A protein has these predicted regions:
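A hydrophobic, multi-pass inner-membrane permease signature
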Residues: 2-115, 360-664
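Polysaccharide-binding and catalytic clefts of secreted carbohydrate-active enzymes
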Residues: 54-387
Length: 664
């Protein structure tokens, strides 16, 4: 029967009360949903948009934010790399604006040419505490290639890795030298050639010249450069690294310092005719020919006269070192014999051939890198938005799945915890409810008192106990206690029960604490790195025993009397009668046991030092220390899914607890 009748519900006051109640409930729902939306939104962000708070990611609807995230991802989250390639300052990713329309002809020619450019590095392959698409795909390709055997990968690719989570793509070559010719580098380059051309970062020596020399020397204000050189450039984008050294003295000095000391040697070439100076350099660098041969076993010679002058970057690292040191020698290596040949020069030749005009008529051309990046972004908006939305979740799932035993360990741990909790706690509560010993409330008080101490207080004592667990004394003492109870109940029936229990307990303590250690010599065993170490500390729960005891007390005693008349055993009464009528409270117990086992990470980390026994929560805890804030949010969302599913499964059973007393 409703509290308010249908007639009463027609009045304005009652409707106003109803409306107020629903409004308050709606506010409560919003207050819960909005923080959830903030966390879900934060789980699909990166460094670019992590500062934007809102219930949805802005790059879903704003092309500007999408372009910022695309540039961040492509340039491996290194602002310096993007600035050097773009040839202009960026500052932060959030300051990037949509580029203005430039020369469409140059852009189309650049897009047609860039697949032929030999100077590039794969973008979206690495990042600071984030794993972009190509980095994740590279790891997956190697995982499939070696069937998940990290040792085989380390051996065949000559790249030692202890675990798959430590495997990352090699970083872009820094400073002057390229990567050495190693199997792991070759594997990455082979993978890079399978990725889309739009993911390639085209090297830009002009941008390097601005970023690594002009700005440190003349600040980022181009007017300072203009005053020093007598020029009228509007920006550093108009300052190019010429193929040959300029005539103007200060520009020539800038060119010399940058090319000799900073520019990667892959862009530097020497004119023929420096054989004698180069041989003199080697004779001064190496005391004897034998010393040279020892350092250059791949190119042993009888005398320095047999050494050829390198015209470009050599292949071996020792030859590259000689090449760099020779470049720095201003006496033996004149500036007139050095020239630069890089992507811009090749692009200019491509444009000249395509337009059938002399190269001199179009040089210098500023490569439209920014416009090309924007074109690539706008041409793949749907795929990019999906990738940015899912990549953090893919990163977390890859991290979990690459630790093959993490899921298995968690599943075993949760099953053991729930199963044993559904066995131990109901048995204890049934004994207190069914037999009602005089010490019932003392036992309940002792169980409830354990809740006064936080779990962190017992971590160290539990660790010490599990490290030196008295397994054999417990078995011996328990067996002695059981035998003593049976013997005393058989031969001393007239003795009070409390006295018999006390005597049996004393016998068990004597056997367990003294006799067994004396006989075995080593009574302790270590339970660390076992499932027993995870399950035993939470095997019995005082609060659940108290809760179950109260629920069992509500079961009518007439049911047990009827079972006694039918000749039911105590186990039958417990299992078929008590447990079958207690499914709602058992669902609460199972949900609590699962939540406690699934979410445990600190205790699991303490008692399980072996990584092979770690659970998912321990791995996610480790992931959060090395990952971006958005990845942490994604890991929390994924970690909450199993608990949510278990709660949904148990919810219907728990709700039956409202009507079960009526049924009984």
């Amino acid at each position: 029967m409703p509290v308010i009748s249908r007639i009463g519900a027609r009045s304005f006051k009652v409707r106003f009360v109803y409306g107020t109640i629903f409004f308050v409930l709606a506010l409560g729902a919003v207050s819960m949903i909005y923080p959830l939306l903030l966390m879900l939104c934060g789980s699909v962000k990166s460094e670019t948009d992590i500062a934007y708070l809102g219930p949805y990611p802005r790059y879903w609807f704003e092309d500007k934010v999408l372009f910022q995230k695309y540039v961040e991802s492509k340039y491996n989250m290194q602002i310096q790399e993007a600035e050097a390639d773009w040839g202009r300052p960026i500052g932060t990713w959030r300051r990037i604006e949509l580029p203005a329309e430039g020369d469409a002809a140059y852009l189309e020619e650049f897009l047609a040419w860039r697949s032929e450019c030999p100077w590039w590095w794969l973008g979206s392959s690495s990042g600071m505490r984030l794993v972009p698409t190509n980095g994740r795909q590279f790891r997956r390709s190697l995982y499939r290639r070696f069937d998940g055997d990290i040792q085989a990968l380390s051996t065949q690719l000559d790249s030692p890795h202890r675990a798959w989570r430590h495997l990352h793509p090699p970083p872009k070559p820094g400073y002057r030298y390229p990567h050495p010719d190693r199997p792991f580098i070759r594997a990455f380059l082979d993978f890079a050639h399978t990725r889309p051309v739009r993911d390639r970062i085209i090297e830009n020596p002009d941008g390097l010249f601005w970023h690594r020399h002009l700005v440190p020397t003349y600040t980022d204000d181009v007017q300072v450069y203009n005053e020093a050189h007598g020029t009228k450039h509007a920006s550093y984008g108009e300052v190019f690294l010429t193929p040959r050294a300029p005539v103007e003295p200060l520009q020539r000095e800038d060119w010399s310092q940058f090319v000799r000391d900073v520019l990667p040697i892959t862009f530097i070439h020497l004119d023929p005719g420096l054989e004698e100076p180069f041989r003199a350099f080697l004779a001064d660098r190496y005391p004897t020919v034998e010393a040279y041969n020892q350092a250059h076993p791949h190119n042993a010679v009888d005398s320095f006269d047999d050494v050829d002058q390198p015209l470009a970057m050599p292949q071996h690292r020792i030859d590259q070192t000689d090449f760099v040191e020779f470049l720095r020698d201003q006496t033996l290596c004149p500036l007139e014999n050095i020239h630069v040949h890089g992507p811009r020069q090749v692009f200019e030749q491509f444009v000249a051939q395509r337009r059938r005009v002399p190269v001199e008529s179009i040089t210098p051309i500023r490569m439209p890198v920014i416009a090309a990046d924007f074109r690539d972004c706008m041409a793949n908006t749907r795929a990019l938005r999906w990738d940015f939305t899912t990549r953090n979740y893919k990163h977390v799932l890859d991290y979990i799945l690459l630790h093959g035993r993490g899921i298995v360990n968690t599943l075993i741990y949760c099953v053991l915890s729930v199963g044993l909790a559904l066995l131990v706690n109901p048995v204890a509560a049934y004994a207190l409810s069914r037999y009602k010993p005089p010490s019932t409330y003392t036992v309940l008080l002792f169980c409830i008192a354990t809740m006064a101490f936080p779990g962190e207080v017992t971590m160290i004592p539990s660790f010490l106990l599990l490290k030196r667990f008295p397994l054999w004394p417990l078995i011996g003492g328990g067996a002695a206690f059981g035998v003593a109870v049976w013997l005393l109940s058989k031969f001393m029936r007239d003795t009070p029960e409390l006295l018999r229990i006390t005597m049996a307990l004393g016998m068990g303590i004597l056997v367990g604490a003294w006799a067994v250690p004396q006989l075995t010599g080593r009574p302790y065993v270590s339970l660390l790195n076992t499932f027993a170490a995870l399950v035993l500390p939470g095997l019995a729960n005082g609060y659940m025993i108290f809760l179950l005891k109260g629920f069992f007390d509500s079961i009518p005693r007439q049911l047990y009397e009827a079972a006694d008349i039918d000749g039911a055993s105590e186990w039958t009464k417990f299992w078929s009668l008590t447990m079958s009528l207690s499914t709602p409270i058992l669902a609460v117990l199972a949900l609590g046991a699962f939540t406690g086992a699934y979410s445990a990470f600190m205790m699991a980390l303490i008692v399980i030092p072996d990584e092979d026994m770690w659970t998912i929560m321990v791995w996610l805890f480790q992931l959060q220390h090395i990952s971006h804030q958005s990845v942490v949010y994604a890991s929390l969302v994924i970690a909450a899914i199993p608990t949510f599913l278990v709660f949904v499964f148990c919810q219907g059973i728990i709700m039956k607890g409202i009507v079960v007393p009526v049924d009984k």
